[in-house]
C-alpha cells in the first residue's frame, strides 16, 4: 500500500463496499491506510461512497498537524490505533447491530455463533466521544490486548488489520455476530 494513487483508489473501493453492504450510511464512517510517514484518510465531509479522486483523501502524520482541520474528525482515533499496533489499515463503520449491542452489553460483546467465536473472540466496548483523548486512550488500551475489532459504545466499530480487505471482513463479522447475538437474546425473552 505504498503508492498514493493506489491508496486513494483502495479507500474509494472499500468505502463503496461498506456503504453497499449496509455497514455505514454513505456520509458516516472512515477508512485509513498507514503510509511511510503517517496515514492516508478520508477528508472531513466526504462521503464514503463518493470518493472519486486523490483530493478526497489526505495524508497526515502520526501526530497532530495543521492538516487535521481538513482530515476526518476520527483522525485522532486512527492515529491512536496505529501508534498502539502494527496495523496497516483501519475501517471505522457504523454497523447497526454492533451499535445496539454496545448499548446493551457492559464491557464486551461475546459472539455466540461458530464463526464469530474463533474469528473475533470477544469484542471490547469502549467509551469516549469522537476525537477525544478518552476515546483514543480506550482504543489503544483495547488494541494492546491483540483484538481484531472494537466497538465504541453507541457509535460504531473500529477494525484494524493487515489491509482494507482484512478490516472489511472483521467489520462484517462484528456485525454478523452482533446480529446473531441480538436475535438470539430476543428469541429467548
Feature locations, PLM:
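Glycine-rich flexible loops
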Residues: 1-189
Amino acid at each position: 500500500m505504498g503508492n498514493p494513487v493506489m491508496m486513494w483508489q483502495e479507500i474509494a473501493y472499500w468505502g463503496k463496499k461498506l456503504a453497499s453492504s449496509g455497514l455505514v450510511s454513505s456520509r458516516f464512517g472512515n477508512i485509513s491506510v498507514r503510509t511511510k510517514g503517517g496515514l492516508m484518510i478520508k477528508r472531513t465531509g466526504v462521503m464514503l461512497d463518493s470518493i472519486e479522486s486523490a483530493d478526497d483523501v489526505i495524508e497526515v502524520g502520526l501526530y497532530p498537524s495543521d492538516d487535521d482541520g481538513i482530515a476526518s474528525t476520527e483522525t485522532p482515533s486512527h492515529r491512536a490505533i496505529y501508534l498502539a499496533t502494527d496495523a496497516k489499515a483501519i475501517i471505522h463503520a457504523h454497523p447497526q447491530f454492533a451499535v445496539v449491542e454496545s448499548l446493551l452489553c457492559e464491557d464486551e460483546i461475546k459472539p455466540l455463533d461458530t464463526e464469530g467465536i474463533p474469528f473475533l473472540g470477544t469484542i471490547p466496548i469502549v467509551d469516549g466521544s469522537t476525537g477525544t483523548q478518552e476515546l483514543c486512550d480506550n482504543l489503544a488500551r483495547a488494541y494492546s490486548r491483540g483484538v481484531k475489532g472494537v466497538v465504541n459504545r453507541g457509535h460504531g466499530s473500529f477494525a484494524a488489520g493487515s489491509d482494507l480487505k482484512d478490516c472489511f471482513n472483521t467489520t462484517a463479522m462484528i456485525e454478523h455476530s452482533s446480529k446473531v447475538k441480538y436475535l438470539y437474546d430476543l428469541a429467548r425473552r
